[in-house]
Amino acid sequence: QDAAKGEALFKQCQTCHRADKNMVGPALAGVVGRKAGTAPGFSYSPLNHAAGEAGLVWSQENVVEYLADPNAFLKKFLTDKGQADKATGSTKMTFKLANEQQRKDVAAYLATLK
């Protein structure tokens, strides 16, 4: 995991995200360690809210999996928690990052944002 490479890759994310302010996507400073769906002032999808209420806390590992397929990750999380009935709809995030090493690098960078 290379946070410097992740910072460079994060430029792709800046269409929707910033570290310090909500845009189309939530502010990402402090995301690692934060409960899903809880960035102050951001209007999340019901799917994101449900995952947070079911106990999803963003770890680097969760971020790596999420970036591969956000909707599939959240739906699997809810289903694994016995809440398949809440695993409906979709997250606002449609971007997917196929390369696992790149996902790890981005997650490492996000972990540096406080």
Curated annotation (Swiss-Prot):
PTM remark: Binds 1 heme c group covalently per subunit.
Transmembrane helix listed as a keyword: no
A GO term for molecular function: metal ion binding
GO cellular component, as recorded: periplasmic space
PROSITE patterns found in the cross-reference section: CYTC
Main location: periplasm
Modified residues (Pyrrolidone carboxylic acid): Q1
Keyword field: Electron transport, Heme, Iron, Metal-binding, Periplasm, Photosynthesis, Pyrrolidone carboxylic acid, Transport
Key word Transport present: yes
Compartments, record wording: Periplasm
Residues that coordinate or bind heme c: C13, C16, H17, M93
A biological-process GO annotation: photosynthesis
Function: Cytochrome c2 is found mainly in purple, non-sulfur, photosynthetic bacteria where it functions as the electron donor to the oxidized bacteriochlorophyll in the photophosphorylation pathway. However, it may also have a role in the respiratory chain and is found in some non-photosynthetic bacteria.
Family membership noted in the UniProt record: Belongs to the cytochrome c family.
Protein name listed in UniProt: Cytochrome c2
Organism: Rhodopseudomonas palustris
